[in-house]
Curated annotation (Swiss-Prot):
Key words, A-Z: Cytoplasm, Oxidoreductase, Peroxidase
Gene Ontology, cellular component aspect: cytoplasm
Name assigned to this protein: Hydroperoxide reductase
Entry's EC annotation: 1.11.1.-
Outcome of gene disruption: Mutant is highly sensitive to killing by tert-butyl hydroperoxide (t-BHP) and H(2)O(2).
Amino acid sequence: MDKKYDITAVLNDDSSINAVSDNFQITLDARPKEKSKGINPLSAFLAGLAACELATANAMAAAKMITLNKALINIKGYRLTNPSDGYFGLRELNIHWEIHSPNEEEEIKEFIDFVSKRCPAHNTLHGTSNFKINISVTLVH
C-alpha cells in the first residue's frame, strides 16, 4: 500500500508558522529563542527523524527478538550558516541511541542498523548528497 503525507504550513503575522497534518498542529518558529513561540523548523525536522526511528524500532523489535525496555535518541546536527559552496543544508548528523535491553550489544547494533534501513525518514536522508549520518548506540542493561 502506498502512503501519502500531507502537511499544510501557514506563516503567521508574527513570523511563527503553524503546520497541520491529520488534524494535529505544531507551532514552529525560526526566530531567536527569546522571541520564539515554537520549536525551530530544523529541530522539528530532526525530532521527526528521531520519532520515525523510534517508531520503526518499536514496530520491529518483537519480530527481531529484541526486548526494548526503553529507547531514546539524541540527534546533533551540523550546518554552515555562511557556506562558501552555497550549500545551506545539514552537513552531518550524529545520531546517538540509548537502548535499555537485556539483549547483547552485537544484537542491538545489528537491530539499529536494520531499523535505520527501514525507517522512511532515515532512508530518505541517506540518499541525499552532501550529507553524512553517524550512528552511535549506548546499551543499558
